[in-house]
């Protein structure tokens, strides 16, 4: 079974957490694309969605699903997204698609974070197989890079990428993260950092793993 097929299995299983007559939070990325495709089958049962990226907004609208601004809602029942890496405790690295800041904002509005992954994204230690994205205000890029080196990482400027917020991304390689919550706060305290791709403060409440045997749900 291909990775794409496993993503579709996880995305289909996530529909069970969507309650009728609610506005849901939707992330971004390849697994979320599969979820939005699946969501179209029950679009008449929900009020709409708040999207974490322009790309997801466009896809939702193309499916005929109403898109709300984050400032229009007081809270969300669920936020549904993928991850680049996830631990058994629900801590994640996200931001491969450069939408990490908006993903943090929308996920913070939700009572529950539902994370959809295929089995290749499961790790014991964050940073083991995927670099950590850090969104940075452009003028602070070099300063932030030096601070990340001091923390033990190897930052690389993601050339040609500008976030939906007009900022740049540094991808931090060779960076095993043994204390995700502490490191999330440490990096966010560097002047010029908008946010980083560690999701430990807002961890996943439910993990859906797409496998060849079907969807495995971890609560």
Curated annotation (Swiss-Prot):
InterPro entries: NagB/RpiA_transferase-like, Ribose5P_isomerase_typA_subgr, Ribose5P_isomerase_type_A. Homodimer. It catalyses: aldehydo-D-ribose 5-phosphate = D-ribulose 5-phosphate. Substrate binds at residues 28-31, 81-84, 94-97, 121. Keywords: Isomerase. Belongs to the ribose 5-phosphate isomerase family. It comes from Haemophilus ducreyi (strain 35000HP / ATCC 700724). CDD domains: RPI_A. This is Ribose-5-phosphate isomerase A.
């Amino acid at each position: 079974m291909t990775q794409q097929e496993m993503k579709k299995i996880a995305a289909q299983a996530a529909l069970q957490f969507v309650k009728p007559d609610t506005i849901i939070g939707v992330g971004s990325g390849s697994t979320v694309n599969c979820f939005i495709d699946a969501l179209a089958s029950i679009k008449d049962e929900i009020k709409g969605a708040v999207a974490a990226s322009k790309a997801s907004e466009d896809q939702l609208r193309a499916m005929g699903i109403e898109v709300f601004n984050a400032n229009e809602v007081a809270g969300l029942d669920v936020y549904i997204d993928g991850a680049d890496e996830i631990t058994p405790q629900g801590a994640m690295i996200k931001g491969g698609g450069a939408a990490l800041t908006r993903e943090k904002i929308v996920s913070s509005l939700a009572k529950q974070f539902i994370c959809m992954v295929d089995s290749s994204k499961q790790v014991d230690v964050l940073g083991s197989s995927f670099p950590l994205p850090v969104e940075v205000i452009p003028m602070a890029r070099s300063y932030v890079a030096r601070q990340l080196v001091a923390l033990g990482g190897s930052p690389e400027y993601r050339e040609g990428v500008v976030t939906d917020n007009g900022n740049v991304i540094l991808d931090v390689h060779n960076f095993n993260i043994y204390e995700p919550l502490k490191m999330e706060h440490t990096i966010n305290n560097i002047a010029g950092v908008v946010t980083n791709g560690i999701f430990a403060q807002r961890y996943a409440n439910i993990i859906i793993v797409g496998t060849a045997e079907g969807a495995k749900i971890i609560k």
